[in-house]
Amino acid sequence: MGGKNKKNRHGSSTAVQGATAAANRPRAAAEPRPGGEDAAKKQTPRNSNVAPGSKESNKQGPKTYSFASSSDSGVSVNHDKSVLKVVIEAKLEKRIISLINEHKKLNSNKGTVSGRLTSKKLQDLYMALQKLSFKAEHIEEAMTNTVLYGGDLHAALDWLCLNLPDDALPEGFSQQFVEEEQRARAKFQAPPQRPSAANESATEKGEEGASLKGNPELTMKEWILRYAEQGSDDDDDDDDVKEEEKETTLEKFDPNERYLELTAKLLDARAQATATKQDKDKQGQKEAQERIRGYQQEMKSLEDHPLFNPAVKIPEVKSESKQPKPALPPSEDEPLNFNLFEKKENAPEEKAKKKPPLDIRNFDYTSRSWTGKSPKQFLIDWCRKHYSKSPNPSFEKVPVGKYWKSRVKIIKSHDDVMCVCPTIVTEDSMQAQHLAATLALYELTKGQSVHQLLPPTYRNVWLEWSDAEKQVQEQNKTESNKPRDQFITKLLNKLKVQQNQLKSCSQTQMMEDPEDSWENLACDEEQHETCPSPLLPDDLEPIRNIFRKSRDSMKYKRLLNDREQLPVFARGNFILETLKRHRVIVVAGETGSGKSTQVPQFLLEDLLFNGGSPGKCNIVCTQPRRISAMSLATRVCEELGCDSGPGGKNSLCGYQIRMESRTGEATRLLYCTTGILLRKLQEDSMLKNISHIIVDEVHERTVQSDFLLIILREILHKRSDLHLVLMSATVDCEKFSSYFTHCPIIRISGRTFPVEVFHLEDVVEATGFVLEQDSEYCQKFLEDEEEITLSVTGKGGSSKKYQEFIPAQSGTGLDLGARYQRYSSQTRHAVLYMNPNKINLDLILELLVFLDISPEYRNVEGAVLIFLPGLADIQQLYDILSSDKRFHDRRRYKLIALHSILSSQDQAEAFILPPAGTRKIVLATNIAETGITIPDVVFVIDAGRTKENRYHESSQMSSLVETFISKASALQRQGRAGRVRNGYCFRLYTRERFESFMEYSVPEILRVPLEELCLHIMKCDLGSPEDFLSKALDPPQLQVISNAMSLLRKIGACELSQPKLTPLGQHLAALPVNVKIGKMLIFGAIFGCLDAVATLAATMTEKSPFVTPIGEKDRADLAKSSMAVANSDHVTIFRAYLGWKAIRPEGYAAEMSYCRKNFLNRKALLTIEDVKQELIRLVRAAGFECPRSVEANGLSSAMKALSAEETSLLKAILTAGLYDNVGKILFTKSVDITEKLACIVETAQGKAQVHPSSVNRDLQIYGWLLYQEKVKYSKVFLRETTLISPFPVLLFGGDIAVQHRERLLTVDDWIHFQAPVKIAVIFKELRILIESVLKQKLENPKMSLKDDMILNIIKELIKTER
């Protein structure tokens, strides 16, 4: 074989160029590197010369670890101010990392290792980390600490980012946040340029040696480095060269220059090894030895290169490089001698002895065996073709004793000369020239099959060189990968041992008895306290005695007369007889028939005196509303003659609602809300203590009532002694009957007076209302036009036809049908063009005036009830009536607005009878249909519109949609006018419109989210929610159920693999609130601020205490703004509540003054207080005790203002409960600083606007808003919002993803924060710590968390963020 010399004008070292190119190249994870085995240590171009090696690397490269780019995320970190930065204090960061590592040590056996883990997978993981430029020792440590415990590539990467110091992290993983600027690199000051003429290799090296000898102060190391750096003047100028020039540079690899560079590095490594040995630094010695071994292995491979020149070898290095193992560092008394030439002179005989023998060969061939070109001629022809402007190759004979070698010089260009000389000698000088030509072709045509065009003898030596080069590469590859392979083998053995140990442990555990679950550890007393069960089976004789005494009382006898006047009383015996023959019946009674009070009494009396068996006289009557349960129980107690009221000592009737229970030992008839009965089902799935269940108002089709019907139908199949009565106020009874196998229907007429009904056409005709063409209630798109065809005749008799729309002549209106012929043209015009989707307030005003001036109605005593769809319509009509002079006389008119958001004082006046001669006008929504009864209503004005809460699958949000009412609702509204006398109903829609109405409204189960319902299904072990709800009266869509289950899994209430509740889900099912609010309550208890969080939860489940009186909206908004704090509606409400609590001890007058000043509803505040106490009781009953000391360290008491730290903690818990209801504020900079722009927020489903009632309605800042609900009116609005910081989202939000190179931290793929990788990993690990604490607490609710280090450090972290 032979050696090669090359020179060019730049003289740059190929190795240095390769290293520079690798450093300047962007570090993309998917970029293949030559060799692919040890890219972190060896990025030399040595392997790039070998095509087969490169191909093998590309085909069998490791799995890549991909990093998303900024373009993928759509975020420019350094320029987008909306991407907030996340920073943790340095001291706190160290403490958190220490806590994370300590927790991992204590829980190191929790990981599950895959049984299919192979050495190939471990090798892929190792190489993936290696490609990210992590050091081998760090990779091994990371894999040892993660793979053994079930970790993968991401776990190993997280471990590295968390535990390595910042200066040990590769580029792109640095902790520094500042944008790195491009720095100008200092150029190497080159020595005087050498002559460009090509000199022979030996002569050139001899000159270098002479130069060295002439300067005794110049050490061998300096000479080596100088040799390697010669011609590197313009290294930096080559950064922008084209790709093809880079490839050409890599092809010009000179093993001699690389050998010298490695020699210098080897000497450095030895010096470092000596120093570390003196310092007794074992780790440093190990690292130095590894480097020495690597340098020697590569130097040995270079010595076998065909172009290697032995003259560059140093005797000391050469002798040691032949040793199979790296030499140990020299001892202290034998310092390293860098004057290698002096040693060389002192031992000439030793050098002569080590001179290798000559390789003598004969390459003779006959003209018969080869008729083609000779190698020399082939080389000349090849150079003429490829270097046409250069002279032919020149051959120089080199005598070696009696043998010959030949040196061939090829001038590729004026600054690029190639000179090669084989080490093989021949007896013939011509054969030597052919051999030199063959070697030159071998170097010039890498990867080509040129050897097939050469004579056989030279073809064989070509193949010999090629095989030797491949063998060296393979050996080098094996040697370089040997430490990695040894480590992987050891790690795999450890994994196998660990798996065997786990199998033996699991078998042992299976033999042991399992521990009781958290459910079995619950206290019986607490369960009874949470869900009292008043209906206890016992002897009925004492109950009969009580009933007999009650029937003898004067109150019972007096009210019996009133009961006998009710329509249902006459059907009492028939109802009882039918129920004895059938276990299920449907009672259809109109409003006022008395079914809700009388049917339960019929059953009670019959069970007590006509065959009721002991323990089987327990009647439960469900109501959809709390006020209905309370009022009905009170009325029934009076009719039964009980003086003590519901739940009294001798009372047979009681009630139970969410926050109140009035029952006693004698209670045998219980009125309760539907939700209470559902919670009883969680304790007793068969309702064994109940004999009769009455479900009232089933026509309302609430979610709870439909759910209850599914369960009751299942129970009826299993219990033959249970009876069910369904009571409805409408005629929609066939559907209920068919659902329960066509059970009997008993119809009862109501006790109502006749009601005369007028439709839109009658109202317009009677009032003489004129619909102006420019009125806002006139449909502009239905202009009085008609289509005509015009025929236009042109020149030459040609004609063209045009279609035009022209105003129609008066009297040519469309025919509305025969029923409208008796109405005037003015009425027909109004009916035709009036917009049916907009309530005509002008017409309502005219109608009220008509009722006052018409002789037929003027003297009719009674109130006017106007049904409107929402608060905005109520307020608008209220303003119109208040500003009209005709209604200024307070002695004649009393105007009342009735809505749940308005003050209770106005609503209370609706139930008070006004003085004679005063007409009461009540503006209300559909709450007045069945929820409340205004006793003196005679006139009803029905706008025919309502607002329904509907769930939109596309946007996954609920919205209030204004729509037409159903026929059932229209009849209910009509019936309100016939309670006391003959009434009148004015419908602001035509008769045709009424006939087109749906018979009934869409059931609520088809319109709302189903999370709470799914919780109850799983809590009661009723199977899969999808399967269970398919049995409903109207089954919801599977996608809606799937969305509900997805949310439950996201908040951790349900297991991922099966419909089974987690400990968190078990507790959420016991809390009568939305699942997100329930989670917030539990987090509040765990973090020691249950009182404050329960207050916020109460405001979310009820209504805001802030009120807006009619005509005082501006003042009310100003009062709320003055109380605003922390850019949060929730904290503002809490502040108002704290102020009210502080002022209460001063008396009622001070309390009312505070409420009036701040536009607060005192009743709402009292309700919030009651609900808060109930929620706290429920949470504590589940075992989440919150001692006073913990509360004191959490949030302030009611008498104290909130601090900034406490506000941060409260916001964090709000985020834990309400996430993923978050949105990004779209900051808009206003030109006019006085202008207030609406706050627009980008949510996961699209843009939305903060509701005008929020304190953040005009907030303009970079940040994120948490919102309680998203509703759709004319726009999509966010109600009850709070500005939150990054920490709560990162701690309690969705899945975290890290974009290392961009320093981006992403939550749920759309929420972005700027953060170094280490901080990102910290938050990922904190999530694991939080989950571990929650799991322990939820499985053992009585466990104290007062001194828990994890919770304390998380609270400290939250409170440090501003």
Swiss-Prot record:
Residues 18-27, 66-76 have a biased composition (Low complexity). GO terms for biological process: positive regulation of translational initiation. Residues 231-242 have a biased composition (Acidic residues). A motif (DEAH box) lies at residues 696-699. Residues 89-109, 285-305 form a coiled coil. Residues 1-10 have a biased composition (Basic residues). ATP binds at G589, E590, T591, G592, S593, G594, K595, S596. Residues 576-749 form the Helicase ATP-binding domain. It is found in: Cytoplasm. ATP-binding RNA helicase involved in translation initiation. Part of the 43S pre-initiation complex that is required for efficient initiation on mRNAs of higher eukaryotes with structured 5'-UTRs by promoting efficient NTPase-dependent 48S complex formation. Specifically binds to the 40S ribosome near the mRNA entrance. Does not possess a processive helicase activity. One of its GO terms (molecular function) is ATP binding. The gene is dhx29. One of its GO terms (cellular component) is eukaryotic 43S preinitiation complex. Its EC number is 3.6.4.13. InterPro entries: DEAD-box_helicase_OB_fold (IPR011709), DEAD/DEAH_box_helicase_dom (IPR011545), DHX29 (IPR034730), DNA/RNA_helicase_DEAH_CS (IPR002464), DSRM_DHX29 (IPR056328), HA2_WH (IPR048333), Helicase-assoc_dom (IPR007502), Helicase_ATP-bd (IPR014001). This is ATP-dependent RNA helicase dhx29. The keyword Amino-acid biosynthesis does not apply. Residues 1-76, 182-215, 229-257, 317-336 are annotated as: Disordered. Belongs to the DEAD box helicase family. DEAH subfamily. Keywords: ATP-binding, Coiled coil, Cytoplasm, Helicase, Hydrolase, Initiation factor, Nucleotide-binding, Protein biosynthesis. Residues 28-41, 243-257 have a biased composition (Basic and acidic residues). It catalyses: ATP + H2O = ADP + phosphate + H(+). The keyword Transport does not apply. Part of the 43S pre-initiation complex (PIC). Its main location: cytoplasm. Residues 852-1021 form the Helicase C-terminal domain.
